[in-house]
Amino acid sequence: METSCFTLLGLLVSLSFFLTLSAQMTGNFNCSGSTSTCQSLVGYSSKNATTLRNIQTLFAVKNLRSILGANNLPLNTSRDQRVNPNQVVRVPIHCSCSNGTGVSNRDIEYTIKKDDILSFVATEIFGGLVTYEKISEVNKIPDPNKIEIGQKFWIPLPCSCDKLNGEDVVHYAHVVKLGSSLGEIAAQFGTDNTTLAQLNGIIGDSQLLADKPLDVPLKACSSSVRKDSLDAPLLLSNNSYVFTANNCVKCTCDALKNWTLSCQSSSEIKPSNWQTCPPFSQCDGALLNASCRQPRDCVYAGYSNQTIFTTASPACPDSAGPDNYASTLSSSFNFVIVLIQCALLCLCLL
């Protein structure tokens, strides 16, 4: 059995080596869930100082308040607010899922300027959030080295709309810094190493590539927004806000408020599509829960072209969860590897 034993050990080493090599960051985010469109986030930074106005223009964000809300900045923040070199700004993007991958909608485009090359556009202009190969692929560019001034290309930023363990999350594209580890990134964003590794198809720090985007799931506040609402799914991460229902409602997400979306009628911004904001309609049914004897609020549940929906808040609020989000995602990939290794070793010992 010595020959068989050495053969099996060789297979074991080869298998482990192959699995390690095959696990690497691709820059693509998996998006295979039932939700085909959603709001996602990217973390943008520039090596040079810039302004919020420039970032808004670059990413084709319709309203500056969308960027302000994603970064929890005051609504009166100027468009010309300076953004320091390497300062990260969270930018909301419209995500679309197709063929198991999520990319930003075609509203983000870039026009080639003098001396531009695709690699420069990807790494410098868009801060490493996308690769030049991906730009070339989706725009069907025959030769990435032959582009002309004035050509306009779609910039396919990575994103996802998938749930995590059945829970809603906000997928955030984080550009990995040189020398970073999964543990550091997990601690920064309130998740765990296993979740980050499995979500991005890697095994550990050795496959973590600097200056490449990593899919980071940010815990989202729970809400009562209906599936047929025009703003569904309304997903916000901690310390962020958004104006919705034609600017008539302001919703905020705060971990200190039990990770529950808080929405109030707002007059801070002029309504769009409606001359005046309709009042929140009255909730039907009793607003006092018999089991926990706590009053139930009438909360925001979405909107249609004609009205704002409301519903009674959940019967009894859950106890406040931890500030960070540590997923219970099972490490099935690692388990399979260990199982195969154990099987080969057992055969070797026979």
UniProtKB/Swiss-Prot annotation:
Signal peptide (from-to): 1-23
Membrane topology qualifier: Lipid-anchor; GPI-anchor
Keyword presence, Signal: yes
Lipid tethering residues (GPI-anchor amidated aspartate): D318
GO-annotated molecular function: chitin binding
A Gene Ontology cellular-component term: plasmodesma
Positions annotated as propeptide: 319-350
Annotated glycan sites: N30, N48, N76, N99, N193, N238, N258, N289, N305
This protein's record includes keyword Disulfide bond: yes
Coarse class of the protein's main subcellular location: membrane
Keywords: Cell membrane, Chitin-binding, Disulfide bond, Glycoprotein, GPI-anchor, Lipoprotein, Membrane, Plant defense, Repeat, Signal
InterPro entries tied to this protein: LysM_dom, LysM_dom_sf
One of the protein's GO biological processes: defense response
Disulfide bonds listed in the record: C31-C97, C38-C161, C95-C159, C97-C161, C221-C253, C248-C277
Binding site for chitin: 114-120, 142-149
Residue ranges of every copy of the LysM domain listed in the record: 108-155, 172-216
Location relative to the cell: Cell membrane
Superkingdom of the organism of origin: Eukaryota
Function, in words: Chitin elicitor-binding protein involved in the perception of chitin oligosaccharide elicitor.
Record's subunit section: Forms homooligomers. Interacts with CERK1. Binds to chitin oligosaccharide elicitor.
Protein name as catalogued: LysM domain-containing GPI-anchored protein 2
The organism of origin for this protein: Arabidopsis thaliana
